[in-house]
Each structure stands twice: as C-alpha cells, then as structure tokens.
C-alpha cells in the first residue's frame, strides 16, 4: 500500500507540459468531486433510495505571481508572445482538449521539489482557464489565477484515467 504524505503542508512546484510555472501566492488547491444522481421513488417520498455515479470533476487552482510571459502564454486562451510582448485574441470555440497537457504538482522539501516520486500529483490531461486580476497599485501583487480542469486521458498509457498520486511517469 502506498504511503503518500497527504499530511504534509507547504508549497509545491507546478509544471504544465514540462514548463515550470514559477511562483504562486495564495496556495495551490486540488479538488476532486464525484458527481451523483440521487434515486428516489414516489412511494418513498424524498427519501434517497440509491445513488448513481454520473462522473467526476477534478481541478487544480493555481494563483501565479511574478510570472514571465513565456510561462503564462500557454495558459491564457488566444495568447501569443512575440518580440514586443504578448497579444491576446478572442478564443471563442476553442476546445479544451486541444490545449490540455499534463500537469504535475511536486511537494517542495527544503526549498526544492522533492525527488521522491511518491510526492507528486498528476493530472494526465489538464485544460487551463485563466482568470486575470491584475491590480496596478503600490500595495498588492498581481495574480494570474489559472484553473486546470482534469479531462480523461485519451492518448497515452493512461486512457480514461484523470489523475494519480505518485510516480508521474
């Protein structure tokens, strides 16, 4: 039986498509929720008699700060970095699977990512959605919140799987 250190606290390194996304501010949050339908009968009123699993939703919220354009280009739909900066175009109709890549979170130990493969969480296919809230003042940090939605893998040895704790290979 695996002994993943879920009780540990502290930051993690985040890599999307093998690109280190850099610093975070406010905590990285992983969520996984099983979606169910409740089964009831007219004869038993509102009493739930059974449940049926409809699927699951996995996501990771990553509040990035002090980012370089090259780090966030692939996270902002319609973004392209050129020699003059970054330009963002409308991305209406963009399918998430077309930009989804592997997301790896690795627990930090003594200021560096752990080399223990058991201290990783992997979303095999993660579709990034950015929510930019950049303040321009003298008292706050600019945060680019990116939510990665886990999609079932469709192109590797993990077909149908969404995430794992442990060795990212």
Segments from the language model and where they lie:
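Short, structured patches in soluble enzyme cores that scaffold and shape functional sites
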Residues: 64, 107-109, 150-152
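Charged, amphipathic alpha-helical segments
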Residues: 67-93
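Hydrophobic beta-strand residues in large extracellular and virion-surface proteins
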Residues: 14, 60, 103-105, 165
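Phosphate/anion-contacting hairpin/loop surfaces
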Residues: 92-115, 123
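Short linear motifs in intrinsically disordered
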Residues: 1-7, 88-99
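Solvent-exposed edge beta-strands and adjacent loop segments
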Residues: 1-74, 125-144
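Short, surface-exposed beta-strand/loop "edge" segments at domain boundaries and coil↔beta transitions
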Residues: 71, 108-118, 156-158
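Mixed-charge, glycine-accented linear interaction segment located at domain edges/termini
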Residues: 119-169
């Amino acid at each position: 039986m695996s002994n993943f250190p879920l009780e540990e606290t502290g930051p993690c390194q985040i890599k999307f498509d093998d690109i280190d996304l850099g610093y975070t501010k406010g905590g990285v949050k992983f969520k996984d929720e099983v979606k169910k339908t409740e089964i009831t009968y007219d004869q038993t009123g509102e009493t739930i008699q059974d449940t049926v699993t409809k699927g699951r939703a996995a996501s990771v919220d990553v509040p990035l700060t002090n980012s370089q354009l090259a780090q966030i280009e692939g996270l902002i739909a319609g973004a392209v970095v050129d020699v003059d900066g970054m330009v963002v175009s409308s991305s209406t109709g963009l399918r998430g699977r077309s930009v989804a890549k592997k997301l790896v979170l690795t627990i930090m130990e003594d200021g560096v990512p752990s080399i223990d493969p058991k201290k990783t969480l992997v979303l095999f296919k993660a579709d990034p959605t950015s929510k930019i809230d950049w303040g321009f003042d003298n008292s706050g940090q600019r945060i680019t919140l990116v939510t990665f939605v886990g999609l079932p893998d469709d192109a590797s040895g993990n077909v149908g799987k969404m995430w794992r704790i442990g060795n990212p290979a």
